[in-house]
């Protein structure tokens, strides 16, 4: 099913509940989007749905509304701890967002309790909340939900609670699989009753997703919704109200271009994407220092407890910058995002589309810009062909001030900045080497000197990818980087303590090494003693060798070793060897005379 259009809520075959209609009016949703128009009637008619629609097309309401309608029509009212609907989504941020949208509706239905189960909170608290307040509708991330199913020892048996399940929603299903949740999803599906309605929503279709459809859905209706106004032969995957731009610049120009771009738009709200968590940490700090008083916030996948707070705070502010990784690339709906800036292209072409889709949400206008190196220019054509995502070049940006010296000065005066810069550079190169489109993004073609200057590095880091490379056009700082201190006095105090302990350890290990040498000498003496015993045994067994022969043999061996090590010359060796032999002969003569 593809040819669907927008329509009013009253045009639905089944009339919506009055409270749901009032909520839609409160939220100022007067018309359905194409995906809502296609999905809601089928879902309300008890069909399983596999829906593919572009990012920002209104998929959340496409499952929230029929989910509530199905629960309202239940013959038997749900008890507090009975689960009627389950929504699984890949990230905490998306789960929080869905939970908020759902709350706008459930506040009119006190008979339904809802609960949010995501990482970053104490699972024991989640169990307590569920037992106290119930959870007729659960919004969850896969990891936490799987953990809750296994927590029977805490007095909650979620397996029993989901026996009443009517609706299962897998939101951003392709991302669920991309993020490695396939095993968790299969485990969760094993706990759920077969008699249920299932809705699977995604922005792209893959073979892995097809396998999930076969495993989790029964005779699903497949829906692929295109943008209204897009030609039938086209399958453009970004909203038509989104303007996509690209800019070609050298690696050591990118940072200055980014600053110039953001300074011109200080009163607006932007997302700036980087390829790694370390790059977010480093450039986020740099932007915060150089763009004051603009509000700059950072979020990435390695943040545990702060992510939810930062995400909520950014959604509330009217202007500012959120520096992030692809943790923010899917499904997140932040109002009034003016620009999505991709400082680094993402690791896959599909992720490019999802990043852009954080602006121009549900009918709003928005713009996106990606910075590309000269060697990456063919990526523009690749996106146009592979993702049906046309881009136009932005050329008018003028750099007024070179801020790279300031970036280096920050590293020279604070070890935290210096270390973050080195770590960011290494992580960027490693991520670049793993790029999905490696015919365009070739790590061997990178200008590492220009890249290092763009990162404001004081010296080149040691890493395998740089082995054998020439960096004649990169000038390292004259400062001894080991002497750079942390601005944070406590961290610097701790560092000095560690340096002192390391020095003492090295000195101790040196003394131990000396002791080992002495022990080796003893070992050598024991070895010689063994040789004597062995030779003596041979003599007792009838050998012609006597103790004098043994001593002479050992002395000859020692002399030979000294010669090999260069401790004596050949002349000295011959002389001492003769002396040893002469001595033996004298001793033998005296013994014969006796």
Swiss-Prot record:
<dbReference type="InterPro" id="IPR014001">
    <property type="entry name" value="Helicase_ATP-bd"/>
</dbReference>
<feature type="domain" description="Helicase ATP-binding">
    <location>
        <begin position="40"/>
        <end position="223"/>
    </location>
</feature>
<keyword id="KW-0067">ATP-binding</keyword>
<keyword id="KW-0378">Hydrolase</keyword>
<keyword id="KW-0547">Nucleotide-binding</keyword>
<feature type="coiled-coil region">
    <location>
        <begin position="486"/>
        <end position="542"/>
    </location>
</feature>
<dbReference type="Pfam" id="PF00270">
    <property type="entry name" value="DEAD"/>
</dbReference>
<keyword id="KW-0347">Helicase</keyword>
<feature type="short sequence motif" description="Q motif">
    <location>
        <begin position="9"/>
        <end position="37"/>
    </location>
</feature>
<dbReference type="GO" id="GO:0003723">
    <property type="term" value="F:RNA binding"/>
</dbReference>
<comment type="similarity">
    <text>Belongs to the DEAD box helicase family. DDX55/SPB4 subfamily.</text>
</comment>
<dbReference type="InterPro" id="IPR027417">
    <property type="entry name" value="P-loop_NTPase"/>
</dbReference>
<dbReference type="InterPro" id="IPR011545">
    <property type="entry name" value="DEAD/DEAH_box_helicase_dom"/>
</dbReference>
<feature type="short sequence motif" description="DEAD box">
    <location>
        <begin position="171"/>
        <end position="174"/>
    </location>
</feature>
<keyword id="KW-0175">Coiled coil</keyword>
<keyword id="KW-0539">Nucleus</keyword>
<comment type="subunit">
    <text>Interacts with 28S rRNA. Interacts with double-stranded RNA substrates in vitro; the interaction stimulates ATPase activity.</text>
</comment>
<dbReference type="GO" id="GO:0005730">
    <property type="term" value="C:nucleolus"/>
</dbReference>
<dbReference type="InterPro" id="IPR001650">
    <property type="entry name" value="Helicase_C-like"/>
</dbReference>
<dbReference type="InterPro" id="IPR000629">
    <property type="entry name" value="RNA-helicase_DEAD-box_CS"/>
</dbReference>
<dbReference type="GO" id="GO:0016887">
    <property type="term" value="F:ATP hydrolysis activity"/>
</dbReference>
<feature type="region of interest" description="Disordered">
    <location>
        <begin position="502"/>
        <end position="548"/>
    </location>
</feature>
<keyword id="KW-0698">rRNA processing</keyword>
<feature type="compositionally biased region" description="Basic and acidic residues">
    <location>
        <begin position="502"/>
        <end position="512"/>
    </location>
</feature>
<dbReference type="Pfam" id="PF00271">
    <property type="entry name" value="Helicase_C"/>
</dbReference>
<feature type="domain" description="Helicase C-terminal">
    <location>
        <begin position="254"/>
        <end position="411"/>
    </location>
</feature>
<keyword id="KW-0694">RNA-binding</keyword>
<comment type="function">
    <text>Probable ATP-binding RNA helicase. Has ATPase activity and is involved in the maturation of precursor large subunit rRNAs.</text>
</comment>
<dbReference type="GO" id="GO:0005524">
    <property type="term" value="F:ATP binding"/>
</dbReference>
<dbReference type="GO" id="GO:0003724">
    <property type="term" value="F:RNA helicase activity"/>
</dbReference>
<feature type="compositionally biased region" description="Basic residues">
    <location>
        <begin position="513"/>
        <end position="537"/>
    </location>
</feature>
<keyword id="KW-0699">rRNA-binding</keyword>
<keyword id="KW-0690">Ribosome biogenesis</keyword>
<feature type="binding site">
    <location>
        <begin position="53"/>
        <end position="60"/>
    </location>
    <ligand>
        <name>ATP</name>
    </ligand>
</feature>
<feature type="region of interest" description="Important for nuclear localization">
    <location>
        <begin position="532"/>
        <end position="561"/>
    </location>
</feature>
<dbReference type="Pfam" id="PF13959">
    <property type="entry name" value="CTE_SPB4"/>
</dbReference>
<protein>
    <recommendedName>
        <fullName>ATP-dependent RNA helicase DDX55</fullName>
        <ecNumber>3.6.4.13</ecNumber>
    </recommendedName>
</protein>
<dbReference type="InterPro" id="IPR025313">
    <property type="entry name" value="SPB4-like_CTE"/>
</dbReference>
């Amino acid at each position: 099913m593809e040819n669907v259009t927008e329509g009013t809520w009253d045009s639905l075959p089944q009339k919506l509940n009055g409270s749901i209609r009032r909520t839609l009016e409160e939220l100022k949703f007067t018309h359905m989007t194409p995906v809502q128009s296609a999905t809601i009637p089928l879902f309300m008619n008890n069909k399983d749905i596999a829906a593919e629609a572009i990012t920002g097309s209104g998929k959340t309401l496409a499952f929230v509304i029929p989910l509530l309608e199905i629960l309202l029509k239940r013959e038997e009212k749900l008890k507090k701890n009975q689960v009627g609907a389950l929504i699984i989504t890949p990230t905490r941020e998306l789960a929080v967002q869905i939970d908020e949208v759902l709350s706008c509706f459930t506040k009119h239905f006190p008979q339904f309790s809802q609960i949010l189960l995501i990482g970053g909170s104490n699972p024991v608290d989640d169990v307590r909340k569920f037992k106290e307040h119930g959870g007729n509708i659960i919004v969850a991330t896969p990891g936490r939900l799987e953990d809750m199913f296994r927590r029977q020892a805490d007095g909650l048996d979620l397996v029993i609670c989901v026996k009443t399940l009517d609706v299962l929603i897998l939101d951003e299903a392709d991302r669920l699989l991309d993020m490695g949740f396939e095993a968790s999803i299969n485990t969760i599906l094993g706990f759920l009753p077969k008699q249920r309605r299932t809705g699977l929503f995604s922005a792209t279709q893959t073979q892995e997703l097809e396998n999930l459809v076969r495993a989790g859905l029964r005779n699903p209706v497949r829906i692929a919704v295109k943008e209204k106004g897009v030609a039938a032969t086209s399958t453009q995957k970004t909203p038509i109200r989104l303007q996509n731009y690209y800019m070609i610049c050298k690696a050591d120009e990118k940072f200055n271009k980014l600053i110039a771009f953001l300074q011109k738009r200080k009163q607006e709200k932007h997302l700036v994407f980087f390829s790694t968590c370390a790059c977010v940490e480093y450039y986020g700090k740099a932007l915060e220092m150089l763009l004051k008083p603009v509000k700059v916030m950072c979020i990435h996948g390695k943040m545990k407890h702060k992510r939810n707070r930062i995400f909520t705070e950014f959604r509330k502010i009217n202007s500012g910058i959120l520096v992030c990784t692809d943790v923010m690339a899917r499904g997140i709906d932040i109002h009034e995002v003016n620009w999505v800036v991709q400082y680094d292209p993402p690791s896959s072409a599909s992720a490019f589309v999802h990043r852009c889709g954080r602006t121009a949400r549900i009918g709003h206008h928005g713009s996106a810009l990606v910075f590309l190196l000269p060697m990456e220019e063919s990526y523009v054509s690749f996106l146009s062909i592979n993702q049906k995502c046309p881009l136009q070049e932005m050329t008018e940006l003028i750099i007024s001030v070179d801020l790279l010296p300031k970036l280096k000065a920050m590293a020279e005066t604070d070890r935290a900045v210096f270390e973050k810069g080195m770590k960011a550079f290494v992580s960027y190169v490693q991520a670049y080497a793993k790029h999905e489109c490696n015919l365009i993004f070739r790590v061997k073609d990178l200008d590492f000197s220009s890249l290092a200057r763009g990162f404001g590095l004081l010296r080149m880091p040691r890493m395998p990818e740089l082995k054998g490379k020439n960096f004649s056009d990169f000038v390292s700082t004259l400062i001894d980087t080991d002497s750079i201190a942390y601005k944070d006095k406590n961290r610097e105090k701790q560092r000095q303590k560690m340096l002192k302990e390391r020095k003492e350890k090295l000195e101790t290990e040196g003394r131990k090494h000396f002791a080992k040498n002495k022990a080796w000498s003893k070992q050598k003496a024991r070895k010689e003693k063994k040789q004597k015993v062995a030779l003596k045994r041979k003599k007792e067994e009838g050998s012609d060798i006597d103790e004098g022969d043994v001593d002479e043999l050992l002395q000859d061996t020692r002399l030979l070793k000294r010669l090999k090590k260069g401790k004596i010359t050949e002349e000295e060796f011959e002389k001492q060897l003769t002396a040893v032999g002469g001595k033996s002969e004298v001793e033998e003569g005296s013994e014969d005379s006796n």
